[in-house]
């Protein structure tokens, strides 16, 4: 069954996240698609100190509980520290390791000791075959996913290496996720924030 991970990226309010989760759930149900709602309580790697980071872990987890109780959706959120893992593990279904932290051994191993699925976003600086080293840190995990989110291509640009995507599908016995929207990102491309071109997303996801 096809799985879709979708949401507002950054959790801003209960009303907004609930509306997005409800709409995505309805569409995915219509087409028999497995759905995970995704939102972040803290965007800790913004390009600038002025970048909006979110409403924080306390308010977000309260809202996540409300959304799960009312809609029954599965929830994915990213974590940046071991302390955040202990806070989130009983609320969300998937703990996501951000791409910039995809080689952080302690963070990965702590996430893998929970009952959550662990989704590790492959760093923009890693080759497909480097993922073997990441997976070697995940022996105790309930389930692990690897997400392709683009590869650095010079300054402020990413490309998608579909050869690498196929390599991971062929060589790793874990689900491989494709993050089409972040693969079209232009990191720091707007100076104090990242840019991107959403027009490329439909072509990449075909």
Which positions does each model-derived feature cover?
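Short beta-strand segments at enzyme active-site cores
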Residues: 33-40, 74-79, 178
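N-terminal amphipathic alpha-helix/helix-capping segment at the start of soluble metabolic enzymes
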Residues: 1-5, 62
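Conserved, mostly hydrophobic/aromatic
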Residues: 7, 37, 88, 120, ...
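Catalytic alpha/beta core domains of metabolic enzymes, predominantly
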Residues: 115-206
């Amino acid at each position: 069954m096809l799985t879709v991970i979708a949401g507002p990226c950054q959790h801003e309010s209960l009303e907004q996240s609930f509306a997005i989760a409800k709409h995505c759930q309805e569409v995915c149900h219509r087409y028999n698609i497995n759905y995970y709602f995704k939102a972040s309580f803290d965007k800790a790697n913004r390009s600038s100190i002025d970048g909006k980071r979110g409403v924080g872990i306390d308010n977000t987890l309260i809202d996540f509980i409300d959304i799960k109780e009312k809609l029954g959706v599965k929830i994915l959120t990213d974590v940046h520290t071991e302390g955040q893992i202990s806070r989130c593990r009983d609320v969300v279904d998937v703990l996501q390791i951000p791409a910039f932290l995809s080689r952080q051994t302690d963070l990965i191993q702590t996430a893998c000791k929970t009952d959550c699925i662990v989704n590790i976003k492959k760093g923009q600086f890693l080759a497909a075959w480097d993922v073997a080293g990441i997976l070697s840190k995940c022996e105790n995990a309930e389930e692990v996913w690897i997400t392709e989110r683009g590869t650095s291509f010079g300054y402020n640009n990413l490309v998608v290496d579909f050869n690498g995507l196929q390599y991971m599908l062929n060589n790793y016995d874990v689900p491989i996720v494709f993050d089409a929207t972040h693969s079209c990102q232009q990191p720091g491309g707007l100076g104090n924030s990242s840019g991107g071109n959403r027009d490329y997303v439909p072509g990449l996801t075909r």
